Amino acid sequence: MRYALISKGLSLSQIETEARKAGAKGIKATRLLNQIFCDLNAEQAKALSLVSGLLVKPIKEYKTDQVETALPPVETFSDVSYLLRSYFTPPLTGTGLTVAVLDSGIRKSHEALRNKVVLEANFSDSPSVEDIFGHGTQVAFVVAGGLHSLGEKAGVSPGAAIMNLKVINDEGIGSDESIILGIDKVCDLAEAARKKGLWPTDEMYPNVINLSLGGEDDGDEDNPVREACRQASADYGIDVIAAAGNTGPKMTTVMLPACDPEVIAVGAVETTDELVIWEKSSRGPTVQGETKPDFVIWGTNLEMASHKNDEEYVAKSGTSFAAPMLSGLTGLLWESGRRAYGEGWLFRWTEARQFAPYFSTKPQDAPVKKDNAYGYGLPAMGTMLGQVSQVSVPTGDVTEVMNMFMMMTTMFGMLQGVV
């Protein structure tokens, strides 16, 4: 059976030594995250669990989840993103943002994704980085697909760069091991970029990890994927944004790793003229009692690039596509802030959460405080962009939901302190 050996005080070399002493086989080590993966029998696993400073956890499966839709795709996703970017001169495109998409691979030859992918690596048990299952291509499109052009099918930040780290195999299944090795690779790239003196805006400097995948929340704070996500955020300054899951409206259904306090969990609202939580969007609290998700954003009936050929598009729904929408929004916020305050200005959702009640909106009948359906609410994009860049974003020519995205609230200037 496959296990993860997690450091609780031991060095990576010490863990590997203990594993070899126990007779472990198929050893594979991370570079930075102090975890080792290996094959153990029950007796070997029990012996290693007695070693001080070491945790032994069986490897678990993770899956992507998406819902096919028979409805005509909603046009406003690309339209409102274009409108929002166009209120700035020159228009925002999310340039400078690099999102590591840990998923089922990406069809980088698709017309909407050409020249977007700057790095590829395969940690799944499938033979190539190609998207055979059909999920990662859609996620990448929502982040950075297309061009900033009127009528163009495009994602939120078409100027952003994408890293394709395949951690889900061609049947739609991944594991603790594949996901953690992917996270470790992203941290290694960030550390290498830092050592080279690269600006965080360099395309080889990953800023966000997008995890549109998950497994059942087991309540285990020491779960190896949760450990890896926390390290990526705390030690390497990378926002980890994850899909809440599609198993609502039941309570306590937010997936792992979205359930972790250090991970930004994203639920989905209907892509309509009303702010309504999508029925299948997973709800909190987590098994440990955390209020989740953190935010909600569009996630239903979205038209995205297909993995099947280079000109095809497909309409799907799911929190899998809400998460990359928030990842893409990072690029617009960060770019607008850099214009106002200089290249050294940074934006992280992890730190912005303390201001979330001031830049998010909910239906009138929803709780004012963070709740287990909407979280803090829907980020009002225009509000946030206006505040970080001191540009007034008009709202008169958009629908009710667009106004919710773009309305100005009372928090002017508070995000200037988010660094």
Feature locations, PLM:
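Short glycine-/aliphatic-rich beta-strand segments at the starts of folded cytosolic domains
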Residues: M1-K8
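Hydrolase catalytic cores
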Residues: V142-V143, M163, V167-N169, T253, ...
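C-terminal subdomain of the subtilisin-like protease fold in secreted/lumenal serine endopeptidases
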Residues: K196-L211, E335-V418
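Subtilisin-like serine protease catalytic core
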Residues: F88-L119, P127-S178, D202-N207, D235, ...
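Autoinhibitory propeptides
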Residues: G9-D79, Y87
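Extracellular S/T/G-rich loop segment that most often corresponds to the catalytic His/Ser-adjacent loop
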Residues: D103, E111, M255-R338, T383
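Substrate-binding/access-modulating region of protease and related hydrolase catalytic domains
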Residues: V167-E262, G289-E290, N309-A323, K370, ...
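N-terminal domain-start motif of subtilase-like serine proteases
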Residues: K28, N41-Q44, D65-V101, A121-I132, ...
